[in-house]
């Protein structure tokens, strides 16, 4: 007896019905996708996020410098002529030619008070301990983890939260603004890189709660004033005003030690070195917005960004990191002196007009605009679980 076979068309129809039935049963078992799972998708362009999260050559260079100082640096001090002060030398071995043996090369030179510092060996041990902490923090960061988690810890660094905060940039747009009283009315006022307020009070105010600087500012203070002024004279807003500093060059950690050693009760030099996680978070946000702006302006692939910016030196500005810190400690944040206008000086307190090439200010302005209008669109801050961007107002 011959078997009866179904026509091919009927076989395909039967398979389609069975497949549809199975898919419906699977959907019933799984349920619809939850809004909570979809909300966990990272904010921003995935490719730009991945590229921005790469620390790049600049971070590797700083780590290499710190490791070299930790392993090979030497410190020696000598009395000056007349023994009025001491000359301090930070040196590293350096081969001046491929065949020549390494010889000591001076990395930093400071004039310091005769009796304010510990012996050379103890000072070197303290410097190596500071370098060791610096390296350990960045290596922990490099092994992964959520750098945005620092946003939950920032209030503890300053000891409390603040209701209203003003971050005062140094742009020349402040001149003639009359914003001084409005700035001083905030609970916390953050100023940048020890910018002068004397003579500009009507436009920039006089109140300062925190001075935020890059370590180049501290290095300049130490080189000029370590011998003559307590705490290197690096607190123009008063000896009690704390300073938050991010490290541009690991050798500058020695300046911090020197200035701490010359502190007095009236100038106690309260210095906070920024958390490595905060440094990484700011670097990623700055690079993301710079990448996005590059792609939008040029139409080129994001991979070509390095043709416009040298990764070894590209860096966020002091102002941007101060803004991110304020987001973590303040219920409301106001930004003054960020931006530019035709004819305005780069800094209100200097004659500088040209911007520094290592910063992408336009990209940072895009970031501030998103903080004010679209805070949920800011990448990487969404990784800070339990953190909400506070209201931000950018005063033009």
Curated annotation (Swiss-Prot):
Keyword Secreted part of the UniProt annotation: no
GO annotation, cellular component aspect: Golgi membrane
InterPro entries documented for this protein: Glyco_trans_29 (IPR001675), GT29-like_sf (IPR038578)
Top EC group: transferase
One Pfam short name: Glyco_transf_29
Cytoplasmic side stretches: 1-6
Official protein name in the record: Sialyltransferase-like protein 2
Gene from which this protein is expressed: STLP2
């Amino acid at each position: 007896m011959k078997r009866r076979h179904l026509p091919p068309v009927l076989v395909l129809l039967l398979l389609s019905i069975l497949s549809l039935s199975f898919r419906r049963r699977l959907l019933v078992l799984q349920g619809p996708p939850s809004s909570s799972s979809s909300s966990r998708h990272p904010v921003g362009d995935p490719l730009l996020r991945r590229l921005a999260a790469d620390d790049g050559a600049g971070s590797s260079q700083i780590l290499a410098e710190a490791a070299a100082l930790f392993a090979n640096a030497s410190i020696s001090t000598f009395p000056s002529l007349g023994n009025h002060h001491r000359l301090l030398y930070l040196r590293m071995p350096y081969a001046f030619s491929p065949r020549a043996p390494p010889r000591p090369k001076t990395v930093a030179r400071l004039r310091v008070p005769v009796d304010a510092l510990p012996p050379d060996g103890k000072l070197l041990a303290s410097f190596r301990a500071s370098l060791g902490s610096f390296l350990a923090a960045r290596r922990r960061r490099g092994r992964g983890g959520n750098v945005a988690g620092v946003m939950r810890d920032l209030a503890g660094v300053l000891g409390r939260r603040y209701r209203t905060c003003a971050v005062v940039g140094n742009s020349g747009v402040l001149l003639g603004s009359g914003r001084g009283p409005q700035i001083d009315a905030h609970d916390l006022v953050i100023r940048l890189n020890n910018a002068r307020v004397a003579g500009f009070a009507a436009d920039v105010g006089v109140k300062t709660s925190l001075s935020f600087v890059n370590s180049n500012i501290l290095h300049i203070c130490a080189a000029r004033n370590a011998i003559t002024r307590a705490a290197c004279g690096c607190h123009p807003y008063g000896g009690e005003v704390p300073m938050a500093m991010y490290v541009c060059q690991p050798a500058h950690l020695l300046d911090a030690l020197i200035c701490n050693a010359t502190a007095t009760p009236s100038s106690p030099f309260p210095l906070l070195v920024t958390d490595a996680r905060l440094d990484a978070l700011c670097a990623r946000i700055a690079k993301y917005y710079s990448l996005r702006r590059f792609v939008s302006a040029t139409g080129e692939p994001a991979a070509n960004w390095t043709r416009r910016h040298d990764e070894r030196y590209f860096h966020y500005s002091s102002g941007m990191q101060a803004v991110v810190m304020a987001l973590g400690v303040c219920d409301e944040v106001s930004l003054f002196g960020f931006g530019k206008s035709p004819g305005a000086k780069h800094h209100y307190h200097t004659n500088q007009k040209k911007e520094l090439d290592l910063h992408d200010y336009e990209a940072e302005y895009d970031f501030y605009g998103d903080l004010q209008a679209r805070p949920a669109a800011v990448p990487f801050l969404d990784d800070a679980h339990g953190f909400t961007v506070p209201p931000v107002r950018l005063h033009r």
